[in-house]
């Protein structure tokens, strides 16, 4: 199942939590949304064993209030110490129970579900759930993960090659991303693909990324800016003819090689078409 925000709102997240029966693991960069916290609280009252793990120092944020509110739900709570270093983050956005997983682009805050373009994907694939469970348990316990990663998952550190394979797939690709950044392998792949690439970024993109845009435009990459008053592009997606990517990864060196990030590769034609249609609608609203 694929959900598109802000259209879908917070309901899919709350429904996922409400459907949990025995356990629920949540790993998200930032969590402050009241309906989600309330759903967690009710899940614990039903007897669900809830574990929540967040980043300890989201960029330019103090999270003392957020930590206090999470603890008040009664959930088991940890800061991800495996990625608690300078300029390194637990930037993942996923949750799972014993039979379903949700992977997406949204932080769990009000803006994600009311103002942002975000994508959330749910799966019942047992192998994906098993991989995510092992990753979560390692990070939650503060132990380096060295296990098997399902081939459909895109997990950082070490996600560069899978993102390059998304860019290099035959045919045109459509990208929505909050930022670009100077990471030579990614920029070279985009430049090489040239006019077969369309990219949507928010109009508030940094001056540094504006330089990256000018570089890519020299290679005929098509780039448009989405006005923030329309919708804020926080999504991280690559959509091609054969497969699509949704995840927490920005296309920067740190995101792909240092952070904890989680994404998913989708091969379902119906969902790929849904993503393409949304991209085309967004493209038409850009400038």
Over which residues does each language-model region extend?
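HKD-type phospholipase D/PLD-like phosphodiesterase module
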Residues: 1-21, 27-168, 195-269, 276
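Long, repeat-rich segments with strong aromatic
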Residues: 177-179, 184-188
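Charge-patterned, long linear interaction tracts outside catalytic cores
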Residues: 278-287
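Class I S-adenosylmethionine-dependent transferase superfamily signal
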Residues: 40, 187-190
């Amino acid at each position: 199942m694929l959900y598109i925000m802000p259209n879908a709102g917070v309901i899919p997240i709350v429904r996922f939590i409400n459907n949990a029966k025995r356990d629920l693991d949540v790993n998200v960069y930032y969590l402050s949304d009241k309906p989600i916290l309330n759903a967690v609280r009710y899940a614990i009252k039903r007897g669900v064993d809830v574990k929540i793990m967040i980043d300890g120092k989201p960029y330019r944020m103090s999270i003392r209030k957020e930590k206090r509110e999470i603890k008040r739900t009664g959930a088991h709570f940890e800061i991800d110490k495996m990625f608690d270093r300078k300029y390194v983050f637990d930037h993942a956005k996923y949750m799972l129970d014993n039979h379903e997983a949700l992977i997406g682009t949204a932080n769990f805050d009000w803006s994600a579900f009311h103002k942002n373009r975000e994508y959330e994907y749910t799966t019942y694939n047992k192998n994906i759930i098993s991989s995510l469970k092992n990753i979560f348990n390692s990070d939650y316990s503060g132990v380096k993960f060295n296990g098997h990663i399902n081939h459909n998952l895109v997990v950082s550190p070490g996600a560069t090659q899978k993102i390059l394979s998304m860019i290099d797939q035959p045919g045109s690709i459509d990208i929505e991303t909050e930022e670009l950044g100077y990471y030579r392998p990614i920029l070279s792949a985009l430049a090489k693909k040239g006019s077969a690439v369309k990219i949507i970024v928010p109009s508030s993109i940094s001056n540094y990324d504006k330089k990256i845009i000018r570089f890519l435009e020299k290679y005929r990459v098509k780039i448009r800016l989405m006005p923030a008053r329309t919708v804020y592009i926080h999504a991280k997606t690559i959509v091609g003819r054969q497969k699509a990517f949704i995840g927490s990864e920005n296309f920067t060196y740190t995101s792909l090689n240092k952070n904890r990030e989680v994404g998913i590769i989708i091969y379902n034609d119906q969902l790929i078409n849904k993503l393409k249609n949304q991209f085309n609608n967004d493209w038409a609203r850009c400038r």
